[in-house]
Structures are given as C-alpha cells and as structure tokens.
Swiss-Prot record:
Organism annotation: Marchantia polymorpha (Common liverwort)
SUPFAM superfamilies membership: DNA/RNA polymerases
GO biological process: mRNA processing
Basic and acidic residues bias spans: 170-179
PANTHER family documented for this protein: NUCLEAR INTRON MATURASE 1, MITOCHONDRIAL, NUCLEAR INTRON MATURASE 1, MITOCHONDRIAL-RELATED
Protein name per its UniProtKB record: Uncharacterized mitochondrial protein ymf11
Region (Disordered) residue spans: 145-207
Amino acid sequence: MDNQLFFKSIIATLPKRIHKCQTVSKAPENCAKMPKSIQFRGFSGTGEPFRRLDFRMGQRAFSYERQRPLAFLSFSSLPGRREGSAWTERLRALWKHCKKDQFKAEGLFRLIKDINLWIAAYKKLSPGSKNDGERPKGTSIKALETLRDSVINPPPTLGGGSSTGRSWPKGHETLERGSKALGPESPKETSLALQKKRRRPEMASPHTILPRVLRTHKVSRALWVVGPSDASLALRGLTQKDKDILVQEVIRSILETLYEPYFLSCSHGFRPGRSQHTCLKQIRRDFVGTVWFIEGETSQYFNKIDKQVLIGLMRRRIRDNRFLNLVQKEIKTSLRAGAEGTGVGPLLCNIVLHELDLFVMRLKRIVDRGRRRAVNPESKELWRQSAALIDRTTAHRARVPFPSGAFGRGLGHPQETRQINYVRFADDFLIGVIGPRALAERIRGLVTRFIEVRLKLRLTLDKTRKPIQSRPNTLPAHYVPMGPKETGPKVENDFTISGGPGKKKTQIFCITKNKKIPFLGYLISRDSKHTYNLVRRGRRYRIRRSGGLSLLVDMQKVINRLAEKGFCDKSGHPKPNFAYFQYPQSYSVARIASILRGLANYYHLANSKRQCVTRLSYILRTSLAKTYAAKFKLGTAAKVFAKGGRDLSKPIKAKKARRPLLNRVLGSKTTAHRRRGAGSEGHSPAIPYTRYGQIKLPDTKPLTKNWQPGQARLNCIAKKNLYQNCNREGND
C-alpha cells in the first residue's frame, strides 16, 4: 500500500484531530509495543480523556494515557474542535436542566477528574483575584494533578491523618499512578537527583510547564518534578489550608452551577451578580406601604449547620453517592476553616436556608390577596374635611390638625388587602406584612418554628441592642431582649426563641418617627414628608405625602466601629490614632482615603449619604491631623491643616538632608525611604470628600421589575456597542 494512502486512511479513522505523532521507541510502558506500528495522539469528540491509538494491520488497540496534551494548558480551542472542554459543556448542560424541580444530577464525580477544572479553580484563587487572603501559593500543574489524585483516590493514612479527615501525600509515602510504593532514598541520592532535574532546560518536560498566567519566578524550580517519588516536592508550595481551599473551590464551582438556577430571586447572599446593594434595592422596590416588619438572624449558621439536614436536602438534587461522600468530608473542613464567606460553606448554608425561602413563598401564595391597596376610610374623611376647610377660609391653609400618626401607622386599612414581602441576605432575613397585627404574629410563629424544627437552627439576638419600651400602637419590629420590667404592654402569643437563663423573646413592630429597622448596616425608615406644589384650576396647592421607604446610614454603628479602631470615641469626637504614628504621611493618607472611599461606596444607596460621608471625612481627617500634631510637635490640628491642606496632601514636615558621606553609605535606604513618600516633595495621596459638593448624590433607584444579575453590565455593553456603531457611521 502506498504510504500516502496508508496515512490518509489512518487519519480518517481518528475521532476528530491528530495532535502529535510518536514512534514506538518513545511510547510509554503501559502501551503495547508492536513492530512496525505508529502511535497517534487524538481527542475524542465527546471530550473523553486523551488516548493513544496503536495501528497495525488494520487492527486498533486503545491505551489510555494519564498525561494531558499540551494544548489543554493554553486554554485555547483546537482547530476543528468545538470551543470549550468537556467540563464546561457539562456545566452548561447542568445549568439548563437545573431549573426543573424534578431534575437530579448524575456523574458529578467525573467532573472532578478533569484537570482543567482544577486549573480554573487555581486561576480564580491566584494572585490578582479578589480573595487575596485565601489563595494558594505558587504551584505547578504537577502539584494540581497530585492533589486531584489524592482527592479521587485517597492514599492510605500513614502516621495519622489530617484534621480534615483526609491524608495528603507526604514525602516518600506518596503512591503515584501506575507505580509501586517506594522506600526512602539516601540524602546523597536525593540531592544528586534534584540537581540533575534542575539542570534540565525549560522545554525538557512540556507536560509540567505552567501557562503564562500561572507562571511565577518564585516557583520556577518546582516545575520540573516528574519523578514518582517527588510528589511531595511538587506539593511543597501548598500548605494544608491552601489544599483545603482549592478542593473547596472545585466543589463550589460544581455546586454553584447546579443550585444557582434553582435559588429564588429573594436570596442575595454569596451569589454571583448579587450583593447587599441588590437586596436593599429590592426592599426599596417591594416594601413600599408595608405596615409590620419581622427581622431575624440565625445563630452562627456557618458553624451550627446540621449535616444530616444538609445531605438530605442535597440528595433531592444529586444522584451521585461518590460526590456526596466527598462533600460530606468537606463539610467538616468548611465549618472549621476560615471566616464567613470563604470556601464552600456559604453555598452549603444557602442550600439549607433555601428551604426557608420556599416556605415563606408558600405562605405568600396563601396569604396574598387584593392587587391594589384600598383607600383608608379614615384618611379619606380627614382629607375631605381639610379640603372643605381650605375652601371655606384662608385661615386654615397654613396648618390643618390631624390625629397623631393617623397616616403613619396605617390604621383602619380594609381587611381585604393582605400581602407578604420577603428578602434574605445570607442568615439575615426581613419579612414585610401588609395586614392586621394578628397576621404578622402568626407568620412570625410559623417561620420561627420552621427554622427550629425543620432546619434545626436557632435565631439569635444582637446583644449590643438596647431594649425598646413599647407603647400602644407601636410594636418593635426586630428581636430585642426583654426583662420583666421592660415588656411594655402584654403581647399575646409571645414565645421563647432559646431556653435557659436569660430568655429572649421576639416581637413585631411598625416603623414610626423614632423607631427604624437596622438591616445590613442601613436603617429602614419611612419618609416623613414629601412636599411638592400642585397647580389645578388656576389655584396653587402645597401637597405633602408620606408612606415611602428611605434607607439611612446607621451612623451609630459606623461610629462604634471607628471607635474600636481608635479614630474617635463612642460619641464620634475625633482623637489621635497612634497606630499611624510611625508610618510615613503618604501611607497614612492613602490608608485613610481607602477607608473613606470604602464607606462611601457601601452607603451609596442611603438617602443620607452626603451628610454622613461629610461627618466621617471630618472624623478621619481630624484624627490623622491630631496624630501628626503629636508626631511633629505642632500642638493643634489646625496647624497641621495649615501646612498639609484640608486633604493633607502637602508634606507637613520636610525630612532633613543627610551628610554626603552618610548618603553614599545609606543611599539605597534613603532612596527607598523617599520612594515611600515620607516627607518627600511632589505628588502625594489626598483624603477625598473634604467638601460637601465633592460627594456624589445617592443612588435612589430601586430594582427594575424583571431584574436579572448582570443586566446592568449587559446594558453598558449594549450602549458601548451602539456608541461605537454611531461613530463608525459618522466617520463613513
């Protein structure tokens, strides 16, 4: 047979694409060696593991190779192949089918075997991501493969396991794929072997080369570990905490794809495209006209989650015992490691509290009735009397007396209109009820019992919150500790959240002038007045309306936080913070500016943003000025502002020049010291928001009716494309 025809026939039988050819002499040991045969590397069309094909006399034998092709490292699609790898296509399919209530996912454990998923998880936790404090250190592809194999096939524990229930490979006790247990080598042999490996050129082992996005100078020596007994050296760049974080990120990426389409839109905690701001915007949109508010928070729900309840809920959506067993092992690690918001813990808790969302939505479908709020008869009669007085004489135009709180408390609303609104961010939830007080108390009892009995969680109270004295027609909305002399009027159906000494009870309340609901660092209040002019039939009227919701900054909470950091006292009076005493001016000013910008960014939805940011800027600037007054012995903060300016951008005190000989000896240190900006002239960071006009107006827009995560970004992209098209047409 002609050689050209022979090769064409072989290429036609390949699945999709020929990647590389090798002779039999370079074949691995696990592949059968046949005389006069050629081995090819190819990719399967379904994204199966890479395989070698042996052709001889028209017969074909398969031998799966455990090393990856180099093309996977570049994250680029191959010619003649669909974009994306097997795990991305599988996750897309899961995303489409997970919206069905009866859908159960299978084969999730196979996704963990794909090394590309581990590389993607490492890239997300690598330097430059948002999780700066929770990322693995420099590593290599070999380290990721070893870690993946230890998760899929845990090695036997020698000398005790880790605290997380797993035993990672340690030294010569590591069992590599297709290799036998190796004994300890002598120190001389080990050092000689490492020296030989480090002398190899960079392209000697292409299967252990990191992509450019993962390569760093610090770990360049760790890239050439290819021996089966040197897996511990490949993992030396990863600590035990780093391994746990990386494994949790891989599991989280799979679970997030499975549960994100299933979660309700009322949940905003630890979900992509959602935050505290989206939760507060939904409150501004849906809670208008709400009479009664119920606020709750579960007690340490990151650490007190019930494992049996969690696994039972996950079995409703997952039909893969191997994957569930792996998740069950990771629960212990997730609940022990790190603070809130790290690892897979928040997602697991969202899975549990999703049942609370479904329960409240069922109550909403039962209770809701009446599309539009009927007019309050008492309010309508009062407005009729006021209109008659205005028409009768001009003496009553200035002020018309009304009964106190007749409009604010919503008394006398018809019983035909009832409605429930609900939002949740992580473990904080807020329920708004439109209807009688008995309905609100009934809903409170049902929700609390569901949390304690079905989810096996406990509601908690803020111990720093002072008791509130109840008055007639004014009921507190949040949960407050109450003593025997502070209960106010007797409330029926009051029950205890937690037993034991110091019993704590729950109550419901509506917003009044002096009572506001703290939620996510904001204060939810009702607009007292909204005044505007109306001209009708040639006459001018001054209209005042109330009832809308407004979000305010919880200034006392922010001031208490600043007092803990040493910037002021509990009353908000600035004081010198000697933690910044030894730092140069540029660093201190940049740090204060970062704190102030962060507070302004978080409270950009508050109606009182400009007033509160102005006060916070005064506290932080004055605190730093008093620190510099003590440091440079200027006496008062006014003298510091006179030299440094309102924003403290000018150098307060120039550094004295060194002697010529000392400058030559310590030239590098002096240059580095000036580079940090200590007393050097030139550009220096400045504290923002020194004037009221520099603060931007708050964002008071609520969420749109059919809002979806990422909608704002898509709108910006569409506007950008439209602008570019218009420019192109104009140029043409």
